[in-house]
């Protein structure tokens, strides 16, 4: 598939955020040929290192925002695709509309903040309707949900957040919370394992 490389990079960025101890979400913008032209990752709990166009250490330092911020305003992007590992929130949906992108694909579901069903009813949005596709019904979607839930568990997310995930995506929640999951991801984090190794290891949790 022409987006396979873009999806791999998106998962790689999410895994980088997981290793850095922050919200594990990755996002890229792909051109009509599937080439990555912009990228970003979640940096909410990382200190700002001065990287141009990349928000960090604030509530809005989302992967999609950091990817879309790389697009120059000198053209429109109706023929480009925004790919993200997790169902985007309402802020990131609004940013996608502002960017002129009209196609958004997401890998994993977010039952708490995900806003894929939200429809922006403005003249601007009607001019360039945003078509949203997801989740992915394969190992990529499973991995995206798994590392997000594992991160929520590790970093003590509020009970309403955890309950929303347990109700909304119970299979992914059970796999992320089963015995051995925490130690597995601690080991991968300690080894600074590459994303392909992490996906392979995570498959042991998702195969049951």
Predicted regions and their residues:
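Glycine/small-residue-rich phosphate/adenosyl-binding loop
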Residues: 38, 60-73
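A short helix-loop-beta-strand connector motif used in the catalytic cores of GNAT acetyltransferases and
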Residues: 19-23
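Zinc-dependent deaminase
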Residues: 1-17, 99-208
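A short, polar/charged loop-to-alpha-helix boundary motif
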Residues: 43-61
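Short beta-strand scaffold segments in enzyme catalytic cores
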Residues: 25-31
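Immediate flanking context of iron-sulfur cluster ligation sites
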Residues: 76-86
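Local cysteine-cluster metal-coordination motifs and their immediate loop/turn environment
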Residues: 84-102
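Short beta->alpha transition motifs characteristic of CBS
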Residues: 35-45
């Amino acid at each position: 598939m022409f987006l396979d490389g873009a999806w791999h990079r998106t998962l790689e960025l999410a895994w980088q955020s997981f290793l850095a101890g922050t919200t594990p979400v990755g996002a890229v913008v792909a051109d009509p040929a599937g080439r990555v032209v912009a990228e970003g990752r979640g940096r909410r709990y990382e200190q700002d290192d001065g990287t141009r166009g990349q928000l960090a250490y604030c509530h809005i330092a989302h992967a999609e925002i950091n990817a879309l911020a790389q697009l120059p305003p000198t053209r429109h992007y109706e023929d480009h695709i925004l790919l993200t590992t997790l169902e985007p929130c309402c802020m990131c949906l609004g940013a996608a509309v502002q960017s002129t992108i009209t196609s958004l694909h997401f890998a994993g579901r977010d039952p708490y903040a995900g806003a894929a069903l939200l429809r922006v009813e403005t003249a601007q949005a009607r001019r360039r309707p945003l078509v949203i596709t997801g989740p992915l019904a394969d190992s990529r979607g499973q991995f995206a949900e798994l590392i997000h839930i594992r991160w929520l568990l590790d970093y003590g997310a509020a009970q309403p957040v955890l309950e929303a995930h347990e109700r909304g995506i119970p299979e992914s929640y059970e796999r992320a919370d089963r015995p051995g999951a925490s130690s597995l991801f601690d080991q991968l984090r300690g080894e600074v394992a590459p994303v392909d190794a992490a996906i392979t290891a995570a498959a042991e949790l998702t195969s049951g």
